[in-house]
Amino acid sequence: MHHNNHHHGHHGRYQHHHNQHLKRPLKGGTEDDDILEITPIGSGSEVGRSCVLLKYKGKKVMFDCGVHPAYSGLVSLPFFDSIESDIPDIDLLLVSHFHLDHAAAVPYFVGKTKFKGRVFMTHPTKAIYGMLLSDYVKVSNITRDDDMLFDKSDLDRSLEKIEKVRYRQKVEHNGIKVTCFNAGHVLGAAMFMIEIAGVKILYTGDFSRQEDRHLMGAETPPVKVDVLIIESTYGVQVHEPRLEREKRFTSSVHQVVERNGKCLIPVFALGRAQELLLILDEYWIANPQLHHVPIYYASALAKKCMGVYRTYINMMNDRVRAQFDVSNPFEFKHIKNIKGIESFDDRGPCVFMASPGMLQSGLSRQLFERWCSDKRNGIVIPGYSVEGTLAKHIMSEPAEITRLDNVNVPLNLTVSYVSFSAHSDFLQTSEFIQEIQPPHVVLVHGDANEMSRLRQSLVAKFKTINVLTPKNAMSVALEFRPEKVAKTLGSIITNPPKQNDIIQGILVTKDFTHHILSASDIHNYTNLKTNIIKQKLTLPFAQTYHILISTLEQIYEQIIESTESTGGGGNEKPTITIYNEIKLIYNIGVSIILEWNSNTVNDMICDSIIALISQIELNPLSIKVRNPNFNNIDEKEEITKDDIEKEKEKEKEQQDGDDDDDDEIQIKVVSRKSRKLSNKLNTITEVKLLLEQQYGNFKVDENDPLILHFNLDNQKAIIHLETLTVESLDQILKQKIENSIKRIILSVSPIGNNLNQINNQDNENNIKMETDFK
């Protein structure tokens, strides 16, 4: 018996290019694993704590794992409790970029849940992630933050677990294929394409198709996508052109310092900050009248991370790479790094870039509270602000704000908003969808109102695309019924099958690819091990060889007789081989040794042989044995009518029983043709008997005993027993009698060589499929 451990998996809808496809017809109804389920547990109709779980064919993938910038502690996390039962089975966590709203919950998820899967990021993302979150842990320790989500050991554990990938690199894990593409947005940002059972899902993360000062725009994956999970931060808004945006930004800053004010630019330490530093440094170089105005950048973290920017200059655009050949564009001439507010001379005009970007806490909040009541000062908000944050609140220009110490103070400084957030706008999003043409689009990472407007616009523009906007912890289910395709390999395709042929082989499934192989090819095409179980059984048998062979030939068709030497004395024992698979060695008057290689079919045949031999041994008189004396007939001759007549006469003369001399058992080697003739006569007798039982009495032809006449209510038919054919003018009667004869033949004839009667029952070893000639 061939044992193989089948790899678990399912068929994909993709087509392989090979000579032969074998397709199993789909059953009616939808199976559970045909449903692809997408559940945002963060970023569903909101911006912040991006985290999306995808489930399909038993595989589970999580995209991003961030915190919400408007909250702190456990309430800032994605809704992990809503997927608690799924967490131990999540295969992959794919993190798109280093921003906290996409990555800051990773240490918590890896260290404090039952997650056991693999984590992937690009090289720059991992480098900056480590620095950003080390800083987060230090700040939490200094402020003795009770809401601290994780500590240094959790972060270290996550860094050990994170694996790095490059753009366009293909990774495969547990039947899931992963490829990442450049997403623009920030250094190292990636879109992730995953493929499960031929269904392709693209998660964009935050992306921008517009090239800026240092980054290339997002690329369009060159493959057909089935589901697109895409950000919708800016909804239907359209960004102003880059040069206009830069001009408005530098003008806003210039106006503040020109009136001797202090200009605060709240930014996140990394990402857009580097873009803004490039713009300001270039503007200051071009405007000597501003050289006396210092630009401060208060971030030791950013200074540390600039090393990463220099390392991965090759992942930036041509402009930066060309400039890098001359000098490092990230070594600024007019920008001073300072550690904090203590070493800062707060006199005269200045430009101050400080984090965080939404003024929730930290240095940017301290400076804002210090400067907000002086009308000479100004703030330029350069990125997207989330609902519930101070940055979002002051954009509506309230008369006063509440400081962190709960004191209300007037808001007199000027508030400007210039978007540098490097998110996709409506034009970029719709162009991207137009190029990819996905049947399904799932919107995430957007304010509920913006997302709703974007959905309406996309539905109007792309009438055939299904656009979905799930809320947090709510799932969308999409049905994919992939074509079930198996590829034939090895010796099984030596003779290519025709339509409706039966293919016998072993179906080996691994990671949604399927192959049908001959058992003998298993070790050539897989790493599976096969074993053959050899069976040997001894049965007591005191009857004659003639009884044995005659009985077997009535049941089994392909029989070869030979002799086999056993022991050292040169004794030769009669041997019978059935279907080239099963060997019977006859020990005269003592026993039969049965040998075979175990498999489903051979075991079944051997069961029947054992039953047959046991019956002969218990009651030899119950076995109808044919006359053995036909050695005078030439083996090559056809069986004639005269042969049949002679056989019938000899049967009448034949006396029951064996030779009188019981002391000496004679082995009679009986001619193959004579036994064949005897079996044919038996078949004719059975056919005649059973036809008479079914249709009543037949009249035997006067001149030929092998012709029967049937006559009932003027319905006439002639049956030729020798050829088992029927003549009749009544086609219905003719067909009816022919069908009866076929059924009788099937029941009384030996089992055929091809064993179809048995094999068709053997569903595990047979795969009946239609042949696909695509």
From Swiss-Prot:
Region Disordered, residue ranges: 1-30, 636-665
Keywords, ordered alphabetically: Endonuclease, Hydrolase, Metal-binding, mRNA processing, Nuclease, Nucleus, RNA-binding, Zinc
Keyword Hydrolase attached: yes
Subcellular localization, as worded in the UniProt entry: Nucleus
GO CC, alphabetical: mRNA cleavage and polyadenylation specificity factor complex
InterPro entries named among the record's database cross-references: Beta_Casp, CPSF73-100_C, MBL, Metallo-B-lactamas, RibonucZ/Hydroxyglut_hydro, RMMBL
Names of the cofactor(s): Zn(2+)
EC number from the UniProt entry: 3.1.27.-
Pfam annotation, one family: Lactamase_B_6
Active site residues of this protein: H423
Residues that coordinate or bind Zn(2+) 2: D101, H102, D206, H445
Cofactor mode of binding and number, as noted: Binds 2 Zn(2+) ions per subunit.
Binding residue positions for Zn(2+) 1: H97, H99, H185, D206
Gene Ontology molecular function: 5'-3' RNA exonuclease activity; metal ion binding; mRNA 3'-UTR AU-rich region binding; RNA binding; RNA endonuclease activity
Ranges of compositional bias, category Basic residues: 1-26
Biased composition (Basic and acidic residues): 638-655
Protein's GO biological process: co-transcriptional RNA 3'-end processing, cleavage and polyadenylation pathway; mRNA 3'-end processing by stem-loop binding and cleavage
Keyword Nuclease: yes
Top-level EC class: hydrolase
Chief localization: nucleus
Protein role: Component of the cleavage and polyadenylation specificity factor (CPSF) complex that play a key role in pre-mRNA 3'-end formation, recognizing the AAUAAA signal sequence and interacting with poly(A) polymerase and other factors to bring about cleavage and poly(A) addition. Has endonuclease activity, and functions as an mRNA 3'-end-processing endonuclease.
Family of the protein in this entry: Belongs to the metallo-beta-lactamase superfamily. RNA-metabolizing metallo-beta-lactamase-like family. CPSF3 subfamily.
Subunit record text: Component of the cleavage and polyadenylation specificity factor (CPSF) complex.
Entry-linked PANTHER family: CLEAVAGE AND POLYADENYLATION SPECIFICITY FACTOR FAMILY MEMBER, CLEAVAGE AND POLYADENYLATION SPECIFICITY FACTOR SUBUNIT 3
UniProt-recorded name of the protein: Cleavage and polyadenylation specificity factor subunit 3
Annotated source species: Dictyostelium discoideum (Social amoeba)
